[in-house]
C-alpha cells in the first residue's frame, strides 16, 4: 500500500523539465496565436533588435494611433524584452482595437514559448487571458 501512495504522489522529472524548455522552431523562433473579439493574430518572436512588424509593415505604420502600438508593446515592456526581440506578425478580422488586443495576446503567448519563466509575470498582468 505504501508503494501505491508513493507512486500516486510522485512527480515525473521529465514532465517538469519539459514545461521549462523553450519551444522554438529550426530558425530559433517562438510561435503563438492570439485572439481577441473576432481578430486573430499569428506571431513569431526571435532574438534581435526592437522591430515589430504587422502584416509586413512596421507597427507604427500599421497602427496610426500610438495607443494601439503601446498595447501590443506591453508584454515586451513588462518582461524587459522591448529592445532584445524581433516580432513578426500577421493579423486579420475585426477592427484596430481588436487586432491590437489579439497581437498583445499572441506576443504574450509567444514570449511564454520563448522563455517559460515569463509565464507567471504575464499571467499576473492578464496578458495570457483571452476575451
Q: Which residue ranges define each predicted feature?
A:
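Structured, basic alpha/beta domains of bacterial-type, RNA-associated proteins
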Residues: 19-35, 41-92, 97, 101-131
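Intrinsically disordered, compositionally biased charged tails
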Residues: 1-27
Amino acid at each position: 500500500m505504501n508503494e501505491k501512495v508513493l507512486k500516486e504522489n510522485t512527480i515525473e522529472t521529465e514532465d517538469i523539465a519539459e514545461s521549462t524548455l523553450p519551444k522554438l522552431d529550426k530558425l530559433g523562433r517562438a510561435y503563438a496565436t492570439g485572439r481577441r473579439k473576432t481578430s486573430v493574430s499569428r506571431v513569431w518572436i526571435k532574438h534581435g533588435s526592437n522591430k515589430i512588424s504587422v502584416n509586413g509593415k512596421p507597427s507604427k505604420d500599421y497602427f496610426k494611433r500610438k495607443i494601439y502600438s503601446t498595447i501590443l508593446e506591453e508584454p515586451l515592456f513588462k518582461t524587459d524584452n522591448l529592445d532584445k526581440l524581433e516580432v513578426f506578425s500577421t493579423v486579420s478580422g475585426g477592427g484596430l482595437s481588436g487586432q491590437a488586443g489579439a497581437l498583445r495576446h499572441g506576443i504574450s503567448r509567444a514570449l511564454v514559448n520563448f522563455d517559460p519563466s515569463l509565464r507567471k509575470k504575464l499571467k499576473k498582468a492578464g496578458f495570457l487571458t483571452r476575451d
